[in-house]
Every structure is written in C-alpha cells, then in structure tokens.
C-alpha cells in the first residue's frame, strides 16, 4: 500500500484559509486580549461570519475521512494566538462529548445549539475537572441522582478549570451516578441554557491563554430532564450492570472525550511552537552581533535545528494519531497520548529557546515570544498532564499496572 504525506488540494486550501484568518484577524488582536484577560467576542463573531465558527465547519472537519481536518485547522489557528484560538475552539470539546456519547437525537438537538447563529454566536463548555479531581477522575465528587418521580437528574458539585464555564449557553457536565464504581460509575449530562442552580464561580487569572475564559462552574440542585443524560438511561443502566458484574463495558465518558481530542490539542501546541520558531528564525537572520547575523553562530543555529526537528516530529505523531482515530483503529501504544506528550513538551522547549535567541527582547512584551511561552506551558498540564500521558503510554507498552 502506498504511503503519501502530501496534503490534498482541499486540505491545502483549508490550511491557507485558516492561516489567512489567523494572520489578518487573530494576530492583530492577540496582545490586546492577552492584556485584558477578556473573551474576544468580536473575533468569534468574525470567525462565525466566514463560517470558521459554525456547526457545518465542525461537522465537516470532524468527519473528514483523513482525520487531518481538525489538526490542520488547530495548527494554523493557534499559530495566530493560543488564547484566542481556545476561545474559538473551546466549544468543540463539549460538541465532541455529545457527538461521541450522545444518541442521534441528542446530537441533532444540542450540537447545533452550541454554536448559536452567524449574527449571535454562542459558546458551550465541557465540565469535567474539579478542585480535587483533575488527572484523578476517580476522585470526582459531583453527583447526579435520578428522581424517578419527575424523570429528572439532580446535579450537585463544583467544576474547575472549565473553558467557557459560566458564560456558555450549554454546559456538558460529567458526574458520578454510582460512587462505588468510581470512574466506571460516571455519566455525562447536558445542562440547557437558563437552567436554575448553575452559576459561574471563580474566574481564574491565568499565566497564559488569557483570552480564553476559564472558570469554576457551581451546580446547586441543578435539575435536568432525563433526556439530557447522554446516551440515555437504558444504555447507562446496562453499562452500570456490567461494571457491577466486573465485566468491561468501555471507558468513562470524560476519558472517551479526551482520547478522541488529544491529537487535536497536540496540534494546537504545534501551532504555538511553529509561531515562536518562525519569530526566532527571522530574528536570528537579521540580528547582528560581532559583525555578523547571530544565525551564523553554531550555538544559535543548532538550537534552531533542534526546534525545527521537534516541530516536524510532533506533526507526524499528531497526523498519525488523528488518522488512526478517524479510521477507528485502536491506540495500541497510546499513540494519542504520545502525540499530546511530545507536542506539548516541544511547545514549551521551543518557546523557551525562542526567548533565549531573542535575548532581552524575548523577555519583553514588544515581541510575541514571551506570550507564546506563557501560552505553551498549559500544554503539559491540561487535557492530561505530561506525567499522565507517560503513565498511559507506559501501561500500554508494558502491559503492567503501573501507578
């Protein structure tokens, strides 16, 4: 079977289209919204106007046969700016959860509503992490109790680090329905707009990705109709019964979403790394010290060589994992985690080296690499820390119950 790494004409057009938007709209607004730590609604509206923020675009790229539509989009958008990029794509994590775990009726009802309209775009939030349950999803405390008399689920708890939390129209919340089963006793629920009892808690002031809204979501006796349980109650009851019998019945809803989205998140990190590398490369070619461009110094040139190599290697890991996921192939060696681990750590290393190459200029806000370095760090933390990725990979390659 022939192997080709050439992008199709359609893929190159997609790449160029998103890149142009990132160059013309995202980059000019990046420093302002980083400084303000505010959600970039005007940029989201521009994305909606051209169809970049829409259900049609999400569906087209999500179901792209090659699996590369989402990674290509992510890399170019986050090349523009990571904070604004997350503001634009944050809704897709909630949409991905409903698409992966919901019934056909639920997907048709809730996913379109997440994006709003061209003139009035809205956002959605996926709420999984908690103050005491980040990587350890088994420590989740948010509870969902079924009220049979009213056919409603009652949700109580606090979610942390929720992208778009509190400002979203629709929240997708993961909760424990059977505490004894730990991760296998969890389910996800859609909380519709205007539901009583849901409120925004603390809005976090962050080191990076400041244009992305990140906050706590407080759930106080939140009642949602039975139809808001993703997958439906019959499916949940069957899964819980198998879990109680000790029979494997698939992973929990949060982890299923994370596994499917890790290559996309890794592609975001590549966009940040590539942007910083390009700034450093251009700077090294024009900055002169001791009578010659600093790129002619081996110490600088070798740093750039390592940066370029790591970016290219990261992209290949991402493309492979994204293709495997789209083809329905199992991640036998935790390929999704490999892509997230390597790309996330590459972003941190590349942005730090870019700052070093720019010297004192790199440490100022007159140049964008200090912002890129702040943004990059989150990619070794969220959607599974680097340590968790290594744990997943180690378990996969060893077959041992490593802790």
Regions found by a protein language model. Name each.
Residues 142-145:
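A structural signal for short hydrophobic beta-strand segments in well-ordered beta-sheet cores
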């Amino acid at each position: 079977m022939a192997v080709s790494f050439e992008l199709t004409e359609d893929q190159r057009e997609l790449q160029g289209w998103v890149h142009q938007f990132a160059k013309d709209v995202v980059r000019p607004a990046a420093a302002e919204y980083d400084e303000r730590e505010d959600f970039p609604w005007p940029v989201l509206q521009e994305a909606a106007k051209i169809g970049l923020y829409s259900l049609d675009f999400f569906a087209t790229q999500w179901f792209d046969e090659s699996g590369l539509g989402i990674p290509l989009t992510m890399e170019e958008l986050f090349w523009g700016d990571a904070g604004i990029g997350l503001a634009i794509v944050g809704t897709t994590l909630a949409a991905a959860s409903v698409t992966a775990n919901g019934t056909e009726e639920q997907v048709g009802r809730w996913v379109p509503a997440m994006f709003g309209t061209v003139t009035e775009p809205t956002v959605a939030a996926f709420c999984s992490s908690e103050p005491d349950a980040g990587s350890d999803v088994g420590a989740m405390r948010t509870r969902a109790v079924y009220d049979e008399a009213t056919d409603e689920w009652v949700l109580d708890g606090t979610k942390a680090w929720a992208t778009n939390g509190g400002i979203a129209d629709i929240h997708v919340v993961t909760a424990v329905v059977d505490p004894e089963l730990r991760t296998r006793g969890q389910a996800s629920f859609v909380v519709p707009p205007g539901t009583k009892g849901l409120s925004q808690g603390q809005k976090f002031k962050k080191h990076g990705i400041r244009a992305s809204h990140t906050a706590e979501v407080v759930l106080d006796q939140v009642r949602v109709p039975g139809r808001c349980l993703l997958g439906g109650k019959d499916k949940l009851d069957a899964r819980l019964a198998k879990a109680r019998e000790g029979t494997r019945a698939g992973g929990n809803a949060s982890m299923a979403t994370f596994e499917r989205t890790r290559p996309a998140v890794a592609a975001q990190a590549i966009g940040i790394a590539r942007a910083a590398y390009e700034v450093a490369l251009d700077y090294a070619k024009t900055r002169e010290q001791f009578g010659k461009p600093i790129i002619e110094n081996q110490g600088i040139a070798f740093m750039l060589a390592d940066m370029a190599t790591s970016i290219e290697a990261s992209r290949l890991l991402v493309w492979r994992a994204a293709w495997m996921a789209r083809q329905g192939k199992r991640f036998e060696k935790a390929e999704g985690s490999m892509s997230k681990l390597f790309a996330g750590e590459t972003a941190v290393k590349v942005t730090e080296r870019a700052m070093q190459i720019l010297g004192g200029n790199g440490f100022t806000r007159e140049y964008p690499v200090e912002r890129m370095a702040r943004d990059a760090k989150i990619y070794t933390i969220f959607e599974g820390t680097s340590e968790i990725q290594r744990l997943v990979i180690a378990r996969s390659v060893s077959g041992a119950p490593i802790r």
